[in-house]
Amino acid sequence: MNDYIRYPSEWKRNEEVFKIWDQQTGDNTEITVACAVQALNVYYLPDFIKWKLEQGFTKINMWPFGAGGINYHFVYHPPHLNVKVLPKWFKEECRKKYEEFYPWWEANWEKGIPSWHKGKVEYDTWRNA
């Protein structure tokens, strides 16, 4: 998806940069990644969040930022990329995918908690962030 939406950006290079930011910056560094949610990628956001959490990052979007997942900004212009223009059947497919994803995220919520908060953040605090 990245290679299509953010051309000429290449996803493999983005992965390398995420790892550099996470591993080669000072301990006082916090990195926030935000995604422009739009018609072309809204279906894939659960995949992106799961990928991010499974990387074991220690500085990228750690709780409470994006609940340990990612931050979002919705695209409103141009109008044809606004998620509101999607057909109802596709919105239902997105809803189904998100609802299937939520239990995984809830079971793995601690993956987004930074090490200095481990044991200090309870599930309910995370859930309500």
For every predicted segment, state its role.
Residues 1-129:
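Radical SAM enzyme [4Fe-4S]-AdoMet core and its adjacent flexible, acidic
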